C-alpha cells in the first residue's frame, strides 16, 4: 500500500477506463445481489414469525403485534370469534390427521373471506380463530358468518366428517380491542353451550 497521491494517479493512468468501469459494474452487481438475498431472507423470517405453520393464517405473534400497535388506532372494529366444534372427538375417532384437515378446512374458508387489508384472520389458539374487521359495513359480519357456515357444510362432504363451529361477535372502538375480543369470545362460548344442548 502506498498513500503517495502521485503513485495513485500513475496507477489509474495505466489502467484502461474500460477496466475500471467493468470493475465498478461487478461491484454494483454484487451489492445489488447481496441486498436482494438479504431482503428475501428477511421476508422469509418475517413470514415464519407471523404465520401459523398448519393453516397458513396469521398466528398469535402477529395478532399480539396488531392488537398492540394497529387496532387501537382504528375507529370501529368488529371481532368474529370462531371455535371448531368437536375437535377432540374428531381426533379421538378418526385420528389427528383428520383433526388437522378439519382445522385447515375452517382456516381456508375464513381466509377466503379475508383480504389482509381490512379483514384479517388469525389462528388464536388450538381450535380458535379470530377475524378482525376494520370499519365494517352494516351487516358485513352477519354475511361473513352465514357464508362461512354454508361453506363448511360443503367442506364436510369433501373430507367426509362434519365440520361446524361456534361463533361470537362483538364490536366497538379500536381502543377497546382487548375488551371487544373478550366479548366476542364470551359470545362464542355461549353459542358453543347452545350447540351442545341441541
Language-model features and meaning:
Residues 1-14:
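Hydrophobic transmembrane alpha-helices
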Residues 47-50, 59-78, 85-115, 122-126, ...:
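Conserved long alpha-helical elements within nucleotide-processing catalytic cores of c-di-GMP signaling
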Residues 112-117, 147-160:
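Short catalytic/binding micro-motifs of nucleotide second-messenger systems
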Residues 153-161, 176-198:
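Catalytic/regulatory signature loops of cyclic-dinucleotide turnover enzymes
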Amino acid at each position: 500500500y502506498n498513500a503517495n497521491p502521485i503513485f495513485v494517479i500513475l496507477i489509474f493512468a495505466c489502467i484502461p477506463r474500460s477496466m475500471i468501469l467493468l470493475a465498478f459494474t461487478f461491484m454494483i452487481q454484487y451489492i445489488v445481489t447481496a441486498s436482494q438475498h438479504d431482503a428475501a431472507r428477511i421476508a422469509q423470517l418475517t413470514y415464519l414469525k407471523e404465520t401459523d405453520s398448519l393453516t397458513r393464517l396469521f398466528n398469535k405473534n402477529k395478532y399480539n403485534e396488531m392488537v398492540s400497535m394497529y387496532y387501537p388506532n382504528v375507529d370501529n372494529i368488529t371481532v368474529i370469534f370462531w371455535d371448531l366444534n368437536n375437535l377432540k372427538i374428531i381426533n379421538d375417532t378418526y385420528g389427528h390427521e383428520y383433526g388437522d384437515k378439519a382445522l385447515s378446512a375452517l382456516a381456508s374458508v375464513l381466509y377466503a373471506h379475508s383480504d389482509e387489508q381490512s379483514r384479517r384472520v388469525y389462528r388464536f389458539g388450538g381450535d380458535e380463530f379470530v377475524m378482525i374487521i376494520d370499519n365494517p359495513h352494516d351487516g358485513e359480519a352477519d354475511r361473513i358468518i352465514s357464508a362461512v357456515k354454508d361453506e363448511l357444510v360443503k367442506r364436510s362432504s369433501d373430507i367426509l366428517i362434519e365440520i361446524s363451529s361456534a361463533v361470537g361477535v362483538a364490536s366497538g372502538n379500536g381502543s377497546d380491542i382487548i375488551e371487544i375480543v373478550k366479548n366476542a369470545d364470551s359470545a362464542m362460548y355461549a353459542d358453543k353451550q347452545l350447540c351442545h344442548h341441541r
